[in-house]
Amino acid sequence: ERLLRLTLSCMASNPLVSRISVHNECPEVRVYVNSIRMARALVNLLENACKAIDPEKGEIQLIVSCCSGTTHWEVVDNGIGINPEILQRMWTHGYSESGSTGLGLSFVQQVVDLHHGTIEVKSSPGEYTRITIILPQNKGEHNGKEHFIN
């Protein structure tokens, strides 16, 4: 819950924040993460989703779920989708299709790697994109900057 609140507070100035619905399917699970970095990673994904949707009728979901000792954070949008040839390159530092710096998704990948997690992407051009961050529960680097988020 705290990580979700932090993430949404960072999105408060985005005019499309009202298009984001949150579904927390495992509020009692505790995951050891760097909350600032993880919130920034989720914000990067949500901001990309905001760019991909139709501002009038687009929808974005932020879904938290648990499965077999892992916690999943999913950002799902009904936007323009991602072409298959871009899927492999989009995590590369500096890669951008939109003219941005290309640092956002590489940062997401670094944060997920730091937390010993993985990222899955499913997308259909013109229909949707689903990006899932999968992290082990109660794992992470214990460097004094991280704490449990539930």
Task: Map each language-model feature to its residues.
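Short beta-strand/loop element within the Bergerat-fold HATPase_c
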Residues: 59-69
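A residue-level detector for a conserved hydrophobic packing site
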Residues: 38-39
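Conserved micro-motifs of the catalytic ATP-binding
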Residues: 30-33
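Short alpha-helical Gxxx[C/S/T] motif in the catalytic ATP-binding
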Residues: 104, 108
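Detector for a conserved hydrophobic position within an alpha-helical segment of the HATPase_c
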Residues: 112-113
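Acidic ATP/Mg2+-coordinating residue in the GHKL
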Residues: 77
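Short conserved segment of the HATPase_c
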Residues: 82-94, 148-149
